[in-house]
Amino acid sequence: MQQLRSAIHNAIARFLKNQPPARIIAVGFALLILLGAALLMLPFAVHPGAHVSPLDALFTATSAVCVTGLVVVDTGDTFSLFGQAVIAILIQIGGLGVASIGMGLALVAGRRISLKGRSLVREALNVESLEGMVRLVRAILLMTLICEVAGAALSFPSFARDHMPLQAVWLSIFHSIAAFNNAGFDALGGGQSLIPYQNDLLLNLVTDALVIVGGIGFMVILDVGRCRGQFRRMTFHTKVVLSTTAVLLVGGAVLLHLTDHMGWLAALFQSMTARTAGFSSVDVGSISNAGLLVIMILMFIGASPGSTGGGIKTTTFFVLMQQVRSIFSKRRLGGFHRRLPDGSLSRAATIMLMGLMVVGCGTFALCVLEPQLDFGRLLFEQISAYSTAGLSTGITAELCPASRVVLILTMFIGRVGAVTLLSLWVERPAPSAQYTEENITIG
């Protein structure tokens, strides 16, 4: 038995050694989803009398691991405490990343971190250097623990007013994990998300803070701490993320206030949660078409690199907007007295184009499969799945099995990254002869 175990371990080690980090991460997410689905299908994972089909379990596990929040069955009404705990763990691992959690467990066990392990974490966190990777993971795990414990403690008074003490404790923990990891799950039951708490100032502000901190990226948080909040000392990346986040947050709130006459607290909350969090303090299905368009744009842009959120990312949006500005101002691409590298625009454009292609193909498939549903609602659902936002106009549970599979694939692509997945399985062509350059008319 020991020899068999050693042989299997060596075979896995040899296999992983020859695989690029991004492929290992993608496979790791897929295996975690399958494991989560299997656990959610256990009889004691659901309430007595409730039933979860294999597809529903797979959808829920995918939504949790990809920190989305779209659901086909209500989390609180369907899943038992065990099932909800499984979902919370999947959210936590999915938000921080399989590689980061794996390194954290290895550090706790006192094991040495290999170069391959450090490369996996670098790929997962989207950082440039391998230097200080162990210290970085320790800081991220500690920061996550502090934020989630503080969030749970501050959320408790709001939930304690409507629930028994022990249940309020669990709801606070579950909500804090979901909010920090930008996953729109709630265990309240009734399918209302946070609508009953739309006027609860404390819970709204705590949720806002958790979502924003989780969505701006771990490197940004550490840089803000290093600079003690002094904006001029921060890195170019941090300045871009913070300024773009502020513009989107305030701009989205103003537009939602104007289009749907939301109160400022609700508009601010909805603008924040649209960018990949998935919570809702208003009925999304009742929002006007103009308001839905604002939310779709915010969802598509999403969070920031190296964070728990999805979308094309705030930095991509910044680069594209700077390119538009540079066309009219005739200035070089950049900002904050810094010039962007030449490859930044092509990468941003590729990410944007791939995102539009995934959303377009997915929406087309949903339109074919669900001809009875409104195009705008199907587009909203697809963007929500791709950006791992988790907001819905209320049609998720009505979708046919094939449509649910489309959303499962979209959520997975959105979490791992369309460009990353494409680069893993598309072989690079061998260098060919250089051809003569010639212009074409564009626009």
Region roles according to the model:
Residues 1-443:
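Membrane-proximal intracellular helices of multi-pass ion channels
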